[in-house]
Amino acid sequence: MKALILVGGFGTRLRPLTLSFPKPLVDFANKPMILHQIEALKAVGVDEVVLAINYQPEVMLNFLKDFETKLEIKITCSQETEPLGTAGPLALARDKLLDGSGEPFFVLNSDVISEYPLKEMLEFHKSHGGEASIMVTKVDEPSKYGVVVMEESTGRVEKFVEKPKLYVGNKINAGIYLLNPSVLDKIELRPTSIEKETFPKIAAAQGLYAMVLPGFWMDIGQPRDYITGLRLYLDSLRKKSPAKLTSGPHIVGNVLVDETATIGEGCLIGPDVAIGPGCIVESGVRLSRCTVMRGVRIKKHACISSSIIGWHSTVGQWARIENMTILGEDVHVSDEIYSNGGVVLPHKEIKSNILKPEIVM
């Protein structure tokens, strides 16, 4: 069985992290975002994943080589020479997705994090006998999104309404699809939208069905949503695999600490914190609602909240980092510095306070 992951372009919304790595390789909960998806696909019998990409394919493939061997799954790239939207990449990868078996294939948006109930989706797809299945999720403010109007009893999709001014429903496209090979015949090789062009055609022919996603869902393509997504992911881990979370007298709420990280005495860590491989957290540090990526050193009595600390950075003693501060790779914050929402590009040294949200070049 095959799957296509829509990787897309430059990840500008997640800069400065994406200045060092393509967005799917940015760590989320201590492993690359895309690895969460590849592992979920492997678990339901997918043996080949095609990455639809237009930026740094060689970096992606080199990085994922080890995981290809470890997970026993084939990973290939389909490279766009121009942006093809959300449907064009399927036409471009047609030969990689068709193997003559007639089996459906998965399509995933690489920005989406969820519990990936792909086994249930396979069963749902077989049960309705339609041409395509999409996953939908309920949201509080549907007017920001394209809303999927569906028949509640069967799941059959009636129509899509883009950013409705009046309430028509609260279910939106969750960016996870299961498609029969025949769907590829409906997509031309040009820049085109699967949501606005392909799916409405299939829905008009009564062949499109929607399954309501159980559990959490988040598009983590920008920093604020990334932080929220981490909270939802750790909540889910607490319910499903609590042994993976860290516990102890210095831990508050849900915290994920890599086994190679070290934490000093008198720290208070949590809630909603991920600490990556090789990190050193010195004594008296306070961390909450943040991600600390691989190889970071946080010195004594520093305080970090609602922020992302990029790979191999250093935060000085008594420094205070908060309010969606994002440190790129290899950033060094001096002792006693305050950052209020600073976005700091890689390889910088911060020697003066950042008093309001700004980009430090």
From Swiss-Prot:
Domain notes: The N-terminus (1-40) is necessary for interaction with CNS5B.
Protein name (database record): Mannose-1-phosphate guanylyltransferase 1
A Pfam entry, by short name: NTP_transferase
Tagged with keyword Transferase: yes
Record annotation: effect of changing residue 89 to L: In cyt1-1; deficient in N-glycosylation and cellulose, and embryo lethal
Binding, GDP-alpha-D-mannose: 6-7, 85, 109, 111, 146, 173
Binding site for diphosphate: 9, 11-13, 23
Residue intervals passing through the bilayer: none
PROSITE patterns, per the entry: HEXAPEP_TRANSFERASES
CDD domains: M1P_guanylylT_B_like_N
